Amino acid sequence: MGSVALILKVMPESPDVDLEALKAAMRAKVPSIQDIQEEPIGFGLKALKVMAVVSDQGGETDALEEALSSIEGVERAEIAELTLT
């Protein structure tokens, strides 16, 4: 089996969400995260771009999306980019 590298765009619930605490919660819940970067959206809101590498087995990317979406302070998480490694 191979691996899949993906970038997910994670939207916080509001500009008031503590992004550092959110990053720590994501890293604790999903150990496969390689990097997290902030991306300004507008009106003080910033999205988090999360880079992770997971197995290419069926359901792994969906499970990652669901894990990130379930974290308190996250409005939604969606795959922005995906490539085989």
UniProtKB/Swiss-Prot annotation:
Keywords carried by this UniProt record: Elongation factor, Protein biosynthesis
UniProt keyword Protein biosynthesis, yes or no: yes
Annotated function: Promotes the exchange of GDP for GTP in EF-1-alpha/GDP, thus allowing the regeneration of EF-1-alpha/GTP that could then be used to form the ternary complex EF-1-alpha/GTP/AAtRNA.
UniProt keyword annotation of Repeat present: no
Protein name stated in the entry: Elongation factor 1-beta
Family stated for the protein in its record: Belongs to the EF-1-beta/EF-1-delta family.
Organism field: Methanosphaerula palustris (strain ATCC BAA-1556 / DSM 19958 / E1-9c)
NCBIfam families reported in the protein's UniProt record: aEF-1_beta, PRK00435.1
One term of GO molecular function: translation elongation factor activity
Family matches, as Pfam families: EF1_GNE (PF00736)
